[in-house]
C-alpha cells in the first residue's frame, strides 16, 4: 500500500549506507515530517476565504489543518493581531509517505513548465522547502468548485545533518532536481 515507505526501507537505506558509511543505523537520515502551509492574504478582507483554504488543504492532505493567526498588527496590510491569515498541516508517518507519493507521481507532473527543484532550496540543515503556485495540480481538488487559485509552501523536514545527505535521500524518492 505505501510504496514509498517500502522503497525507503528496502532500497534507500541501503544506498545511503553505501554512500555515507554510517556506523549506527540510527544515523541514517529519514523524513521526519512534511509541513504544508497555505497563506491566505485575502482573509483580511473576507473571513470566509479561510474556510475555502481549509477545505482545499483538507482534501490535499487527508487531515484537518490548523488555522494560523497573525502575531502582531500591521496597519499597511490592514492586519490585526490574532486575525486568521492562513492554515497549515503537519503530516507524519503513513500520511506523510502517502502525500509524498501523490506529490511525486501525480501532482508534480501536472505543474506547467516544471523542470525540477533547485538545490538552493535546502536550508543548510537538511530540510527542503518549495512552493506550488496552484492547488489544482492535486487530483483531489475539483477545478469547478474552487473560488480562487491559491499556492502553498511545502517543507520536507529530514533528520539529515547536511544538505548532501538530504539531497541523496530525496533523490531516492524520485524528487526531480536540476543543476
From Swiss-Prot:
Gene Ontology cellular-component annotations: ribonucleoprotein complex; ribosome
InterPro entries: Ribosomal_uL5, Ribosomal_uL5_bac-type, Ribosomal_uL5_C, Ribosomal_uL5_CS, Ribosomal_uL5_dom_sf, Ribosomal_uL5_N
Superkingdom as given in the UniProt entry: Bacteria
Pfam families found in the cross-reference section: Ribosomal_L5 (PF00281), Ribosomal_L5_C (PF00673)
Keywords annotated in UniProt: Ribonucleoprotein, Ribosomal protein, RNA-binding, rRNA-binding, tRNA-binding
Keyword presence, Lipid metabolism: no
Keyword Ribonucleoprotein: yes
GO function term, MF aspect, one: tRNA binding
One BP term from GO: translation
HAMAP family in the record: Ribosomal_uL5_B
NCBIfam families: PRK00010.1 (NF000585)
Family: Belongs to the universal ribosomal protein uL5 family.
Quaternary context: Part of the 50S ribosomal subunit; part of the 5S rRNA/L5/L18/L25 subcomplex. Contacts the 5S rRNA and the P site tRNA. Forms a bridge to the 30S subunit in the 70S ribosome.
Purpose of the protein: This is one of the proteins that bind and probably mediate the attachment of the 5S RNA into the large ribosomal subunit, where it forms part of the central protuberance. In the 70S ribosome it contacts protein S13 of the 30S subunit (bridge B1b), connecting the 2 subunits; this bridge is implicated in subunit movement. Contacts the P site tRNA; the 5S rRNA and some of its associated proteins might help stabilize positioning of ribosome-bound tRNAs.
Protein's recorded name: Large ribosomal subunit protein uL5
Amino acid at each position: 500500500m505505501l510504496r514509498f515507505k517500502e522503497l525507503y526501507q528496502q532500497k534507500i537505506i541501503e544506498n545511503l549506507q553505501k554512500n555515507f558509511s554510517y556506523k549506527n543505523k540510527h544515523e541514517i537520515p529519514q523524513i521526519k515530517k512534511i509541513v504544508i502551509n497555505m497563506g491566505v492574504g485575502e482573509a483580511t478582507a473576507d473571513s470566509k476565504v479561510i474556510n475555502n483554504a481549509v477545505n482545499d488543504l483538507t482534501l490535499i492532505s487527508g487531515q484537518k489543518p490548523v488555522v494560523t493567526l497573525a502575531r502582531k498588527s500591521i496597519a499597511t496590510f490592514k492586519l490585526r493581531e490574532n486575525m486568521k491569515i492562513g492554515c497549515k498541516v503537519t503530516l507524519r508517518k503513513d500520511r506523510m509517505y502517502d502525500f509524498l507519493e501523490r506529490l511525486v507521481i501525480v501532482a508534480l507532473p501536472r505543474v506547467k513548465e516544471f523542470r525540477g527543484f533547485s538545490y538552493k532550496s535546502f536550508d543548510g540543515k537538511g530540510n527542503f522547502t518549495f512552493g506550488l503556485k496552484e492547488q489544482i495540480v492535486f487530483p483531489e481538488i475539483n477545478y469547478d468548485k474552487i473560488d480562487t487559485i491559491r499556492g502553498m509552501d511545502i517543507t520536507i523536514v529530514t533528520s539529515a545533518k547536511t544538505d548532501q545527505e538530504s539531497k541523496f535521500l530525496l533523490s531516492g524518492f524520485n524528487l526531480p532536481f536540476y543543476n
